[in-house]
Amino acid sequence: MPFDLDSLKYNEAGLVPAIVQDAGTGAVLMMAYMNREALEKTLATGETWFWSRSRKAFWHKGETSGNVQRVKEVLYDCDRDTLLVKVEQHGAACHEGYYSCFHYRLERDGSVTVVGEKQFDPEQVYGKR
């Protein structure tokens, strides 16, 4: 039975949060936003597409870095307001060069520990920002 993408509960900007998870390990890689068209592109191509709120443009994950995400499964929650995209991650997911965007651990004493190691140098991939 076909799913009506309009039945998802997009926010006032027409976006829905998309949590991206490594399909093999279960690690949470990142969170970004999709609009209806980004979700359509994701389903059609089998790779993740998102909507950049700051640039007001589509972005294909890995387009610049080559670190693409091959979609294995897309799930939505019971409220229909959040997506879970399970992927096979190629390279690092984070634009800071880490495998996961969740590489800052907030300690109980309020300090921050960086977990994981950089897999690439962002300046070499993206240039100076």
From Swiss-Prot:
Q: Which SUPFAM superfamilies match?
A: HisI-like (SSF141734)
Cofactor(s) it depends on? Mg(2+); Zn(2+)
Keywords, comma-separated and alphabetical: Amino-acid biosynthesis, Cytoplasm, Histidine biosynthesis, Hydrolase, Magnesium, Metal-binding, Zinc
Q: Which Gene3D superfamilies match?
A: Phosphoribosyl-AMP cyclohydrolase
InterPro entries, A to Z: PRA-CH, PRib_AMP_CycHydrolase_dom, PRib_AMP_CycHydrolase_sf
Q: Which GO terms describe its cellular component?
A: cytoplasm
Residues the record lists as binding Zn(2+)? C78, C94, C101
Report which reactions are catalysed by this protein: 1-(5-phospho-beta-D-ribosyl)-5'-AMP + H2O = 1-(5-phospho-beta-D-ribosyl)-5-[(5-phospho-beta-D-ribosylamino)methylideneamino]imidazole-4-carboxamide
Keyword Transmembrane helix attributed: no
Positions binding Mg(2+) in this chain are: D77, D79, D81
What does this protein's record comment on cofactor binding?
A: Binds 1 Mg(2+) ion per subunit. Binds 1 zinc ion per subunit.
Annotated metabolic or biological route of this protein: Amino-acid biosynthesis; L-histidine biosynthesis; L-histidine from 5-phospho-alpha-D-ribose 1-diphosphate: step 3/9
Give me any GO biological process, just one.
L-histidine biosynthetic process
E.C. numbers: 3.5.4.19
Location of the protein in the cell: Cytoplasm
Q: How does it assemble?
A: Homodimer.
Name the HAMAP family for this protein: HisI (MF_01021)
Record-given protein name: Phosphoribosyl-AMP cyclohydrolase
**Species name for this entry?**
Pelotomaculum thermopropionicum (strain DSM 13744 / JCM 10971 / SI)
Q: Which gene encodes it?
A: hisI
